[in-house]
UniProtKB/Swiss-Prot annotation:
<dbReference type="Pfam" id="PF16923">
    <property type="entry name" value="Glyco_hydro_63N"/>
</dbReference>
<feature type="active site" description="Proton acceptor">
    <location>
        <position position="756"/>
    </location>
</feature>
<dbReference type="GO" id="GO:0009311">
    <property type="term" value="P:oligosaccharide metabolic process"/>
</dbReference>
<dbReference type="InterPro" id="IPR031631">
    <property type="entry name" value="Glyco_hydro_63N"/>
</dbReference>
<dbReference type="InterPro" id="IPR012341">
    <property type="entry name" value="6hp_glycosidase-like_sf"/>
</dbReference>
<comment type="similarity">
    <text>Belongs to the glycosyl hydrolase 63 family.</text>
</comment>
<comment type="pathway">
    <text>Glycan metabolism; N-glycan degradation.</text>
</comment>
<feature type="active site" description="Proton donor">
    <location>
        <position position="523"/>
    </location>
</feature>
<protein>
    <recommendedName>
        <fullName>Alpha-glucosidase 2</fullName>
        <ecNumber>3.2.1.-</ecNumber>
    </recommendedName>
</protein>
<dbReference type="InterPro" id="IPR031335">
    <property type="entry name" value="Glyco_hydro_63_C"/>
</dbReference>
<feature type="region of interest" description="Disordered">
    <location>
        <begin position="512"/>
        <end position="531"/>
    </location>
</feature>
<keyword id="KW-0326">Glycosidase</keyword>
<feature type="region of interest" description="Disordered">
    <location>
        <begin position="1"/>
        <end position="24"/>
    </location>
</feature>
<dbReference type="InterPro" id="IPR008928">
    <property type="entry name" value="6-hairpin_glycosidase_sf"/>
</dbReference>
<keyword id="KW-0378">Hydrolase</keyword>
<dbReference type="InterPro" id="IPR038518">
    <property type="entry name" value="Glyco_hydro_63N_sf"/>
</dbReference>
<dbReference type="GO" id="GO:0004573">
    <property type="term" value="F:Glc3Man9GlcNAc2 oligosaccharide glucosidase activity"/>
</dbReference>
Length: 789
């Protein structure tokens, strides 16, 4: 079997050294996460954390087989008890999210339930700790919102401990008759030694428990509900069975209360008989000392927020609350995952099979996530936008996260765009999106972050120690970044010199009005109606310009000119910034807009037809019908893609074409609204059109924060450089910035949520809830912090 190498040479699909297919062979260079800066104190300080973003509240360590903790609770729905555990986008929890989180050792979250408010706080302490990673505490505040007649209805919380390595967990002696302070559970692990979990509360609590021996933590809420149902059938009481299986590695503790309650749960490790200061350690992690510690962390969070973003004198208190929620939820959404991606690899060229995949090597990923309820896993192009915010808060976290992603690169320079690692991540994704295709890329947004870091060094934003760490990181990262660019510059190249197109569009489907381009990140944004190799995508061309220019900057900054690199980055960047060539390929003079090019007709629509399946079954389905012959042409859809040359500042400041872009941006009949810029022009034939029977419009009109941020960034740029249009750019910039901030704050005031995207006509939040991936960029818009080019 043979395949095309990144250089265009024919190479065996099997790597000679390992006899593994190349697609699942790691890139042969030292891993970034093995750098000394990520070891020692740094590694230990980040060992424990709220690294289970898919849970309403969960704690784990950054190790594959961790001791994990989590919280569940019961609510009544349609007269039946329902367990809250995994974050759900569809349930009727009013709102939830981190109000504060520093990404390291502190976070405070509020969850607004039907008749209850839960506040969960997490804090770590190294004072007196002997175990690796330190001690930590959880505080759960329960506030019932019931009236006097209902107040006696119990609130049922379920706190659990589970050992993923199936090490036995020991039940505490006083679980059923809690004292002021009681041991819930204990055990021993190789990483942290002997450990104990203590519960302390001044309130009257009723407790029950059950223990399970199973590696299946994903279905824990189901096991608990089965136990509750069985007990209710026996006794009529909604309580756990107070029993456990032999050698249980999971214990669930039911904590019931009818009053307002504060529950402190402390984890201590590294316990040795000769160090009998347990009472002092527990006291320092509970009660008044815990209150003092949480207040200290709260004050420090606010101080750092002011230091990083300098907003206290610029914005009103309501807007500041949203800014803090943006960074708090971004940092609180950082997760740790471990597992193996599934990579598409056809077993036979003649027939498709569900087994047409190979497993990537076992890998860990430390990353932020776009949305805890909808997308609690790593997405490659999202992560670049995430880190534009995070590096300003904690550059060490950014370096490690970017390093984690680059370490996922295979020998050909490809990185899977969506990371589904481990059973918990797998449980939260539709089956059709699990397998990753090695022909498909994703925008190289990580280079936006790396450019920012280099510019930060040039403008002396970092101290000497951090500067040295960034330089050390870039020195090791360069060979991987070089391979990544090489993969793009060969696998995604078009027919014409200087042209590119996103591979992976379905050219045989008749179920989509316009075949999606998932690899572009813009999914259903309209492209050429009939995908083929003649396509030219203006957004990818601009991403490649960014990549080439970034690599050239890194090469010059790091003095890498004396080493062998695969590309002449200076020449490629010059080619892709050639304004005349760009206009020849993509500019439509009639509309004053940059457009894709491809085999296209506007004469397509979805129609209902009766379809006979292979088994003889007859069904009525929406299928695409084409009524006009497609031809090679510019694709007449104005929207976010049209503004990429503007976003990447390829347009000269004195060009009349810049004036045309400003007119398009500010035209209320095109993409302008009082809430932000629309993803697709109102004049487009596919504006707000369904792409299939079940695919609602996604990037066909809705307002998305990442693209608004990039456009706003360039408006800011063009407003500050010399040129005939700078005052016009400034006026548009100020109004767009004001519209975006006002709308996000208004929605947050009404719903307590930052949303995935916003409605194009009303500005209401839509899509995934708690989308504090790139929607959190609203904080950088507030602080007017933009990437430099």
């Amino acid at each position: 079997m043979t395949g095309l190498s990144p250089s265009g040479d024919i190479k065996p699909l099997l790597d000679d050294e390992s006899q593994r297919p190349r697609v699942i062979t790691p890139f042969p260079s030292p891993k970034l996460t093995d750098l000394s800066m990520f070891q020692g104190e740094h590694k230990e300080s980040l060992y424990w954390g709220t690294y289970r973003p898919q849970m309403y509240f969960g704690v784990r360590a950054r190790t594959p087989k961790s001791l994990v903790a989590g919280l569940m609770w019961l609510v009544m729905k349609d007269g039946k008890p329902v367990m809250r555990h995994f974050c759900e986008n569809s349930n009727d929890l009013k709102s939830f999210g981190w109000k504060e989180h520093n990404g390291r050792d502190f976070g405070r979250q509020e969850l607004f339930e039907q008749n209850m408010v839960l506040e969960t706080s997490f804090v770590k302490s190294e004072e007196g700790s002997l175990g690796y990673g330190g001690d930590w505490s959880i505080r759960i505040n329960v506030q019932n919102m019931l009236n006097d007649d209902e107040v006696k209805r119990s609130t049922h919380l379920f706190f659990y401990l589970a050992d993923e390595g199936c090490n036995g967990v020991n039940l505490g002696k006083d679980v059923l008759r809690l004292k002021e302070s009681s041991v819930l559970a204990s055990g021993s692990r190789q990483d942290v030694g002997n450990w104990q979990m203590h519960l302390k509360s001044q309130n009257h609590l009723e407790t029950h428990y059950c223990g399970f021996k199973t590696p299946d933590i994903v279905n824990l809420s189901g096991l608990v509900q089965q136990n509750l149902t069985a007990q209710e059938e026996k006794s009529g009481l909604l309580q756990l069975s107070d029993s456990s299986e032999d050698s249980s590695n999971i214990y669930v503790f039911q904590i019931s209360t009818t009053n307002q309650s504060t529950i402190d749960i402390a984890f201590v490790s590294g316990i040795k008989e000769e160090t009998s200061n347990m009472e002092n350690r527990i006291m320092s992690l509970t009660g008044l000392p815990l209150s003092s510690l949480l207040e200290e962390k709260h004050i420090a969070f606010n101080a750092k927020f002011n230091e990083c973003f300098n907003l206290s004198d610029k914005l009103d208190p309501e807007t500041l609350v949203v800014g803090k929620a943006a960074i708090g939820n971004m940092l609180g959404g950082i997760g740790y995952f471990y597992g193996q991606s599934k990579i598409h690899f056809p077993k036979s060229p003649l027939a498709k099979s569900e087994d047409d995949f190979l497993l990537y090597w076992p890998a860990e990923l430390y990353t932020a996530v776009p949305s805890r309820p909808r997308f609690p896993r790593g997405f490659l192009w999202d992560e670049g936008f995430h880190q534009l915010l995070i590096w300003r808060w904690d550059v060490h976290i950014t370096l490690e996260i970017v390093g984690n992603w680059l370490d996922l690169m295979n020998i050909d320079g490809w990185i899977p765009r969506e990371q589904v690692l481990g059973a918990e991540a797998l449980s939260k994704i539709p089956k059709q999106y699990v397998v990753q295709f090695p022909s498909n890329g994703n925008p190289p947004t990580l280079l936006l972050v790396i450019r920012d870091l280099i510019n930060g060094i040039r403008t002396e934003k970092f101290n000497e120690a951090d500067r040295d760490k960034i330089l050390s990181f870039l020195d090791r990262a360069f060979v991987r970044l070089d391979a990544w660019f090489k993969w793009f510059n060969t696998s995604q190249i078009g027919k014409e010199k200087g042209s590119y197109y996103w591979h992976g569009r379905d050219n045989i489907t008749n179920r989509e009005l316009n075949p999606q381009s998932l690899s572009s990140g813009l999914d259903d944004y309209p492209r050429a109606s009939h995908p083929n190799e003649d396509e030219r995508h203006v957004d990818l061309r601009c991403w490649m310009y960014l990549a080439a220019d970034s690599m050239n900057s890194i090469q010059e900054f790091m003095g890498k000119n004396d080493i062998l690199v695969t590309e002449d980055y200076s020449s490629i960047a010059k080619l892709l910034s050639d304004f005349t060539l760009l206009n020849q390929m993509h500019y439509d003079k009639d509309h004053g807009a940059y457009l894709d090019f491809g085999n296209h007709t506007e004469e397509v629509r979805l129609v209902w037809k009766e379809v006979i399946h292979e088994d003889g079954h007859l069904s009525r389905e929406l299928v695409r019908e084409t009524y006009g012959k497609p031809e090679l042409r510019l694709v007449p859809h104005i929207g976010y893609v049209s503004f990429f040359p503007f976003m990447f500042r390829i347009i000269p400041a004195d060009s009349s074409i810049l004036d045309k872009q400003l007119d398009l941006i500010s035209n209320g009949n095109i993409v302008w609204s009082d809430y932000g810029l629309l993803s697709l022009a109102k004049t487009s034939s596919l504006y707000m059109k369904y792409n299939s029977e079940h695919q609602a419009p996604y990037w066909r009109g809705a307002i998305w924060m990442n693209m608004n941020y990039m456009i706003l960034s360039s408006l800011h740029h063009y407003s500050t450089v010399d040129g005939p249009y700078n005052s016009k750019a400034r006026t548009i910039y100020e109004e767009l910035r004001s519209n975006l901030i006002r709308n996000v704050v208004r929605n947050y005031d009404q719903t307590g949520i930052i949303w995935e995207h916003y409605d194009q006509t009303k500005g209401t939040g839509e899509g995934a809830r708690v989308f504090t991936g790139w929607s959190a960029l609203i904080l950088l818009i507030m602080s007017e912090e933009y990437p430099l080019f």
